[in-house]
Amino acid sequence: MYSKFFSTLCACAVLGTACKKEDNKDPQPTPTPDAKEYTGNYILKTSLKNEDGKSGSSYLQAINKLSATESVDNSKAEQVPYMSSVMIYDNEVYSLDAIDGAYGVVKFQYDRSNGKLTRGAKMDTPAHAMPCNFVKVSDTKAYLPLYNSGTVWIFNPQTMQKTGEIDITSYAHSDNSPDAGFGVIRGNYYYLPLLQLGPDYAPYADHLQSDVLVINTQTDKVEKLISETATHLAMPSQPSYNSCIFMNENKDIYIMCAGYFGFNPQNTHSGFVCIPNKGDLSQTNFDSSKSWDISSTPIEGTPYKPNTIYSVVYLGGGKVAAFVSAAELNVKDPFTDKNGIAVLMDLNARTIKKIDGIPYTDSHSVGIAKYKDLVVFGVSGKEKRGLFGYNPTTGTTQQLLTTTGGADFFYAFE
């Protein structure tokens, strides 16, 4: 979501300001009968929205228990920029600025023995560059796309020092930045989707397609630009959700495409595009027969069809857990309306089914993660907020934790 893309959904970060009365209430846990409790090492990020739905404050903390009878506030949390993203590698937790660039990239160390999160080194980035994510090539090398600047920084995660950069401005459709999203490494290549958003914070009307740069991780050179133009699916990946780009068991790369993010009633196309694993770089390209525009697929268990897709996690066997939006649930303001529906998708059968027991959520609290036998959904619902678990094997759901503010990120250390 962010300046071009982020500005649509959050405009600017206003930390520590008055939040909606609804978001400031501390909801009481409502235990699910026979709900399981879990103990472990977890990282949680929650956010409180202001009345405009585009600004607010976010909090990052370590917790050690998931229980339907427990609630967690933000009194022991580290305040981080609103709409900031989180990256975790081993015991290293990274918080990345979302908008103004003043925060940069901050590294925390997680101690599993005592469950403590300790703030460490910081790497500054240019103002308004928006360093939303990074992908490790090795322990000493990582790629950090700067969404607004048209560059990909190369840095050492151990020293938190920049070591180089890749200029990708020439691949922008109409301005100076192609708006790099979240990439993935397959073999010796870094596949970096380009959102290509215009000044109205939406895909260009004359560029409704999905572009991906293929970068050689040994030379740091762009080898080729590939594009899926057949289905007109646009906005591939998102800058802040690593699971929006994933590989299946065959190492075929699938990329979530949000399209107009539900803001254009005349264009509700969203779904997935695919780069099959051909092995040879010369044969690497999209396969449009594997693309799936979900806009015409009914959501089983509801009267709706999706007008965009917010977030996904690949479960294996062609199954995907996701949050999708339905236009009919936009009552007042798409920034704050509870229009997000938790669903189970089948990439092979091309079906979408509502997951019962997960409250509808807003467009920001849409984090999804896998933990043990569960899919964990972060939710900011009308009556309930927090983490909810879904067991794909049994089809059962339960609330795992009540939070102050919407839960938008969860991670379990194995």
List where the protein language model places each region:
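Bacterial Sec-dependent N-terminal signal peptides
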Residues: 2-43
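Short, conserved, GDST-rich strand-edge loop motifs in beta-rich repeat architectures
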Residues: 192-209, 255-269, 322-337
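Beta-propeller fold detector
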Residues: 69-78, 115-125, 162-171, 222-230, ...
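Beta-propeller blade signature
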Residues: 61-63, 205-220, 268-280, 337-347, ...
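Repeated scaffold domains used in trafficking and secretory/extracellular systems
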Residues: 79-89, 127-135, 175-183, 234-244, ...
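Loop/turn-rich, solvent-exposed surfaces of beta-rich toroidal or solenoidal domains
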Residues: 304-373, 377
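Short glycine/acidic-enriched loop and turn motifs that connect beta-strands
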Residues: 48-53, 99-102, 148-151, 197-201, ...
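Post-signal peptide N-terminal segment of secreted/secretory-pathway proteins
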Residues: 59-154
